[in-house]
């Protein structure tokens, strides 16, 4: 049965317009993105099949071009469309942070950092540079690979803070394993960077670790 033959209240697009996007299931949201199904399979049925094949919505969204296009109903055009949607979401979050103080929008900070780093397959260390009103000046990835005390250089972080004329910053890195709990090396690195940046009067407000769930804040655990 085509989606057009469904009761109007059950059609994903009509349901979204009437009740809001948050009320839709992953399959319904994906069906709206797909727009059409394939022969003998509605968009919602195709969406359910794809979610089953990928294992989760997150896995689908974070797949590379080859993996994405290896599934029935998906191709290069859809992949490009998906990347554009994801980038618009990241830019929307970045715009919120440039407009408001990060202290007034803590969830926006978490959402933005999660959007930027959670999909990375390798460890990435980055900084969110802030002005005197704690608005975002820039986001920069500074180091990639195995993030530990030996691979992250305080001198480089200080150099970039001075280049942006930053008054404060937020440190962040991801754990590709999905476990956001900080290691002893993570905590020692945070202390070293905090000490180095204090010499140029730049405050380290927090260090977020990005895993599978909500970003973990070292400040909230008293580890700053």
UniProtKB/Swiss-Prot annotation:
Q: Name one GO biological process term.
A: proteolysis
Keywords assigned by UniProt, alphabetized: Hydrolase, Metal-binding, Metalloprotease, Protease, Zinc
**Residues in domain MPN?**
102-224
Q: Where is this motif: JAMM motif?
A: 173-186
Stored PROSITE patterns: MPN (PS50249), UPF0758 (PS01302)
Q: Which residues bind Zn(2+)?
A: 173, 175, 186
Q: Is Chaperone among the key words of this record? A: no
This chain belongs to which protein, by name?
UPF0758 protein PSPA7_6095
- This protein's species is Pseudomonas paraeruginosa (strain DSM 24068 / PA7) (Pseudomonas aeruginosa (strain PA7))
């Amino acid at each position: 049965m085509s989606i057009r033959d469904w009761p109007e209240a059950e059609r994903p697009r009509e349901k979204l317009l009437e009740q809001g996007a948050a009320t839709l299931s992953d399959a319904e949201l994906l069906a709206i993105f797909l727009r059409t199904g394939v022969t003998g399979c509605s968009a919602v049925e195709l969406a359910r099949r794809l979610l089953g094949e990928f294992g989760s919505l997150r896995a689908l969204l974070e797949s590379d071009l080859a993996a994405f296009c290896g599934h029935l109903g998906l191709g290069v055009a859809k992949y490009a469309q998906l990347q554009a949607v994801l980038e618009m979401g990241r830019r929307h979050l970045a715009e919120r942070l440039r407009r408001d103080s990060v202290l007034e929008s803590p969830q926006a900070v978490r959402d933005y950092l999660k959007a930027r780093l959670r999909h990375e397959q390798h460890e990435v260390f980055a900084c969110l540079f802030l002005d005197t009103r704690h608005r975002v000046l820039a986001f920069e990835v500074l180091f990639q690979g195995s993030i530990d005390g030996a691979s992250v250089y305080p001198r480089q972080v200080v150099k970039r803070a001075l280049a942006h004329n930053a008054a404060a910053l937020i440190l962040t890195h991801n754990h590709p394993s999905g476990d956001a709990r900080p290691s002893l090396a993570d905590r020692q690195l945070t202390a070293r960077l905090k000490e180095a940046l204090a010499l140029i009067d730049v405050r380290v407000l927090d260090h977020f670790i990005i895993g599978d769930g909500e970003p973990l804040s070292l400040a909230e655990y008293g580890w700053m």
